[in-house]
Amino acid sequence: MKIDLNTIFPSSCKEYIPGKIYKNIKIGMRKVSFNNDTESILIYDTGGPHSDQDIQTNINNGIKKLRVNWITDRQDVEYYDRHTINTNSSTAFPLQNNKALKSKNDKPVTQMFYAKNNIITPEMEYVAIRENSLIQKLLSHTPNTIIPEITPELVRQEVAAGRAIIPANINHPESEPMIIGKNFLVKINANIGNSAVSSDINNEVYKMIYAIIYGADTVMDLSTGSHIHNTREWIIRNSPVPIGTVPIYQALNKVNGIVGELNFNIFKETLIEQAEQGVDYFTIHAGVLKKYIQYTTNRLTGIVSRGGAIIAQWCSIHNKENFLYTNFEEICDIMKSYDIAFSLGDGLRPGSIADANDKAQFLELKTLGELTDIAWKHDCQVMIEGPGHVPMHLIKENVEKQMYFCKEAPFYTLGPLTTDIAPGYDHITSAIGAAMIGWYGTSMLCYVTPKEHLGLPNLNDVKNGVITYKIAAHAADLAKGNPSAYIRDYALSYARFNFRWYDQFNLSLDPETAKSFHDESLPSEHAKSAHFCSMCGPKFCSMKLTHQLQLNSTE
């Protein structure tokens, strides 16, 4: 499948900004040139080499291992033979490495460990430069404004305090560092993955590429069908963004879907297997305690988290406490050896408006706060997953409780959906909640596609989900006063008022769609310089009338 970058992002090219502390690092941005050829702006870009027109990528080869030297130069890791590698299968990634990296002497190799020890890593400088992508442009428009710059030292402080994470497994050197935290740009995640009904590795890889080109900051592989290991290997080797998983899915697959046969040893084996591949963050449902399950029985929709339901059933079958909870410190030992971030799962999240903000949900959240403290003692990076289905008036309470219980660890929410009545449009019902919860302080938003509750998303659904959530995240950034967000709105509005149609299209989140809508009624090239559109026509265009008014006032 060929992706035409000239069609997706016209008048754009990749530009690389060098580091100042680490001179050898180069941060890729998307440069959008204006039609007058004298101005341009740099936009945060998540596509890696896939969005660079000068690089020919081939999914059979994977992408450049950007961070190998950064990782090995710290001299705190060593190579060893991977426990699980699958090279004989017809679906195996052709260039698998039979070696993996791990920390030496069981010492932490996490970004949090370095941050606590006052070390600014290349990853920290990288994300600081990315976050500042549009600030210089804003300064040129408002020279007397004092704008706080995001510095590598600020990044270090936020990571050390646990208010931000940089998911960056040492076995995923292809990843371009990014940061998740309430004092940075709101990020979005795209879920992909096969199912028992539909399994195609190439299709999942292209879903990942499609998602990141359009702006997904991380991707979760939630595969539950065939070839889970190999699907993940292909995705990671081609991904410049952090990859997350829910390891309990593969652990259950290993026991043929029989929940009662799950145990911690199988789960631990799965964690190490995925750690060696390079997974950057794990969803771990360690907060689903046996005593909380009783509070879900009177819910309208019960337990809707797949991981939460698996753990609840296991506890019920064995009449034992959640083995993820009882073995949590051993899990921390694995995480800190590879720098895998925790995404503490909300296994008891509400699956309907009727169940929002109930006792089960908030009991689990409190436990996640306690687990966060334990993980931090091991220097593990942590973010907290959140709901779900929540009406607008109850959204703020979720953020307030999460900030209190979890001491401002980054919040990562699925929407939330603000109503249950719109199957087929749940990307919209959830984007309403996502924009609000992002404004209140959530750090990352998990996208919802139009197929939510209905089926497995295809490429077009992935695009629609990503664009919808880029809108929600950007709206939240504007509301929070993030200076990097403002300049793009300013530039597009300026182009709109001056009837610079191509600049309007090219500055938008989806230039191809914007231009196609304009072409439906005014397809000619002449119309691309017209001082009206088909909505108002030449006589009723308010902006054209305003231009005339301004002209008259100066005469």
UniProtKB/Swiss-Prot annotation:
InterPro entries: ThiC, ThiC-associated_dom, ThiC/Bza_core_dom, ThiC/BzaA/B. Substrate binds at N191, M220, Y249, H285, S305, R306, G307, D346, G347, L348, R349, E385, Y412. Its EC number is 4.1.99.17. It holds the Pfam family ThiC_Rad_SAM. This is Phosphomethylpyrimidine synthase. Belongs to the ThiC family. Zn(2+) binds at H389, H453. One of its GO terms (biological process) is thiamine biosynthetic process. Catalyzes the synthesis of the hydroxymethylpyrimidine phosphate (HMP-P) moiety of thiamine from aminoimidazole ribotide (AIR) in a radical S-adenosyl-L-methionine (SAM)-dependent reaction. [4Fe-4S] cluster binds at C533, C536, C541. The gene is thiC. GO terms for cellular component: cytosol. Homodimer. GO terms for molecular function: 4 iron, 4 sulfur cluster binding; carbon-carbon lyase activity; zinc ion binding. It comes from Ehrlichia ruminantium (strain Gardel). It catalyses: 5-amino-1-(5-phospho-beta-D-ribosyl)imidazole + S-adenosyl-L-methionine = 4-amino-2-methyl-5-(phosphooxymethyl)pyrimidine + CO + 5'-deoxyadenosine + formate + L-methionine + 3 H(+). Keywords: 4Fe-4S, Iron, Iron-sulfur, Lyase, Metal-binding, S-adenosyl-L-methionine, Thiamine biosynthesis, Zinc. Pathway: Cofactor biosynthesis; thiamine diphosphate biosynthesis. Binds 1 [4Fe-4S] cluster per subunit. The cluster is coordinated with 3 cysteines and an exchangeable S-adenosyl-L-methionine. Signal peptide: none annotated. Its cofactor is [4Fe-4S] cluster.
